[in-house]
Amino acid sequence: MAIDYAQISCNLASIIEEDSVFLFLIDKLNNLDISRRKISFNFIRLCYTYYILIKFNSRFKDTFLARSFIDYMHQNISDFIDENVELSDLYSNIYVRLQDASPKVVKNLFKILERETRGQSTNPLWHAMRKNCITATKIYDIYISKSFSGIQEHSYLGDAVLYGIKHERIIEHLLKTFFVKKPWISKTLGLLLDPSSGVFGASIDSYYGISFNDNNLIEVGDKVVIFELKFRYKYLREKNDLFVSELLQNPSEIALAKFILSHPIPAIEYRENGKMPSAREYLITNNPLYDSGKKRRACLTPKNLTFDITRLIPMNEKNVSTAIIFDVVKDCILNTLVAYQKAIFTIDAFINPRHRYYFQSILQQYVMTQFYIQDHDNPENIEKENLPSVYIVSAIFRKREDDEKNCRLLIEDTEYLEEEIPLILLITPITIDAEFTSRVIKDICCIWENKIAQQTNLKIWAQSAVRQYMAASSARPKTP
């Protein structure tokens, strides 16, 4: 019998709607008395997740979700279901046992949740876990507005989003083959919940450098690279398009700039030195080659961002993007299209720190760094150079021509039957400012604590762990 993932998602959503995390706090943890310590939300996150899963599995007996998480709770939160404990005190008791558990046990519980949510958008539990969680798609709006009011998860699935999902695998393969050029373990990660706060969640598109232990749990070592993949649907064109043809005939930055400028809203925004960029595009440049000559409409910068953007731009404008141009060779006998690198060069394009994608990137790097710190043998002596880094990858494809639609597109020995033809990859490194990231995290944790207090009258601590993050991000003095 086929598993009905849509129905599972619907059933999970109904459970969460019945019992939000706020109602859970009021109803299940109202007897919590731990005056010796603060009530920490990361333990509440684990309690609440356990509660939701137990309730779901009891009500819908034909499906058992996250068995490994439940089993690990039973095995490692020692005898937390005590027959002498009143039912009304059950989850308060679980909370206390979690708080007294070893850091390794707590870390593993968050890692098991990551494993249980792999597949991301195809996994019902991934969708459920993102509720009552500050994800990369929400962080910008929350930080700018200083409020959760009206903040909703983006669930629009238009052509651009669907094309992006469809092409994630081939974009990752292109990165592996033509940019990283190293052995690559390719597993889709689930939701990485910040183990320190339990508030933030990051879903990584692609990565390099993460390993997996014998239990298939992630191990975050030195120099992990995070790739945020963006499919630029607005540039999906026919091969005979004038600007596509020119780029393929003469793959240079001049041809690339003409191609970029051929769209009414160019994907790389030109800004003069010292001028504030708009928030429209996530890549900007100081190179006049990308100047469209059109006057940009002025857009006020949020007051709480102006100072930081003037600091973040100089940090990032030193970066250059790597441009890789692709074409294919057609074999009529084998009915194949073999993708190859036609040209590679760098361009003066860098991340726009005013854009929401910059905020997505810093959250992903922060959460991954928390796992790195907790996995490190000696976290007090972490080298800044070994922290996770982030790249944003802009992928542009062209449409298949009629005589290409039934061909097998090949990258190395892997076939792609439905994907369009790769044309451009722009790989842009992002410079993270730990001070700014720490302030964003701390501010949002405070907003989160205030929201819980308003909803429940409970004083909950959302531990940000920014001290450890700042310490890890600071350059260590050289020994004489």
Curated annotation (Swiss-Prot):
Transmembrane segments: none annotated. The keyword Iron does not apply. It is an enzyme of class 3 (hydrolase). GO terms for molecular function: DNA binding; endonuclease activity; exonuclease activity. Signal peptide: none annotated. Gene3D superfamilies: Herpesvirus alkaline exonuclease, N-terminal domain. Keywords: Endonuclease, Exonuclease, Host cytoplasm, Host nucleus, Host-virus interaction, Hydrolase, Nuclease. GO terms for cellular component: host cell cytoplasm; host cell nucleus. Its EC number is 3.1.-.-. Plays a role in processing non linear or branched viral DNA intermediates in order to promote the production of mature packaged unit-length linear progeny viral DNA molecules. Exhibits endonuclease and exonuclease activities and accepts both double-stranded and single-stranded DNA as substrate. Exonuclease digestion of DNA is in the 5'-> 3' direction and the products are 5'-monophosphate nucleosides. Additionally, forms a recombinase with the major DNA-binding protein, which displays strand exchange activity. HAMAP family: HSV_AN. Interacts with major DNA-binding protein; this interaction increases the nuclease processivity of the alkaline exonuclease. Belongs to the herpesviridae alkaline nuclease family. This is Alkaline nuclease. The gene is U70.
